């Protein structure tokens, strides 16, 4: 049996701030507007360095499934990774993490939040979803992972918007839209059913979406 957990390691993070090991350091919008990508870069570097520590902690306890935080790069929707002052160091750390994960058979995944919605009738939401999902995939790329469902990026369909068939059609169109999702993002992409009967069941996803997206 394999064990895993999601995002926050309570043992390592529930300690005095100076000793805290966590991957979701962020800042409020006012701070971001004042300090910009320099501060975002510093926090992202601290987050990936701590991600490496968390995986080593996991390995010592035979924990090899880990869902990573979606907040590794603070305010990632507001800049490109390549513009970060520390991106070269961040890349090296992520590559090292990827090698460690492969060598020790760790499976790493992502589950972006509910604001990621390819089925949204609002194009602005869809565009933000493209960037969010592609950003997650780029982290895996920087780790050196071959794109597959083994390093999955898992989301929900979202709402039904009063018509499941039309929503499914819109989802499929947005999934395939040129210039939207990167190829590697599509190869890592998975959908999860909802718990509520009125939302998206496993059968709904299989019947209405799977056959058109794979």
Regions found by a protein language model. Name each.
Residues 133-214:
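Eukaryote-skewed repeat-based solenoidal scaffolds used as protein-protein interaction platforms
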């Amino acid at each position: 049996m394999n064990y895993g957990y999601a995002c926050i390691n309570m043992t390592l993070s529930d300690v005095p701030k100076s000793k805290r090991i966590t991957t979701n350091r962020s800042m409020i919008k006012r701070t971001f507007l004042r300090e910009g990508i320099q501060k975002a870069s510093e926090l992202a570097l601290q987050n990936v360095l701590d991600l490496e520590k968390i995986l080593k902690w996991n390995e010592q306890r035979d924990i090899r499934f880990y869902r990573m935080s979606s907040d590794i790069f603070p305010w990632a929707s507001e800049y490109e990774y390549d513009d970060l002052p520390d991106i070269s160091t961040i890349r090296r750390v992520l590559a090292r993490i990827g090698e460690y994960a492969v060598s020790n058979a760790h499976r790493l995944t992502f589950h972006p939040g509910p604001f990621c919605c390819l089925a949204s009738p609002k194009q602005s939401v869809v565009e933000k979803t493209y960037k969010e999902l592609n950003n997650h995939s780029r982290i895996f790329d920087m780790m050196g992972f071959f794109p597959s469902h083994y390093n999955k990026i898992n989301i929900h369909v979202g709402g039904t918007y009063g018509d499941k068939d039309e929503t499914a059609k819109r989802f499929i169109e947005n999934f395939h839209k040129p210039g939207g999702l990167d190829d590697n993002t599509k190869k890592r992409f998975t959908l999860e059913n909802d718990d509520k009967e009125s939302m998206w069941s496993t059968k709904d996803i299989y019947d209405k979406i799977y056959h058109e997206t794979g």
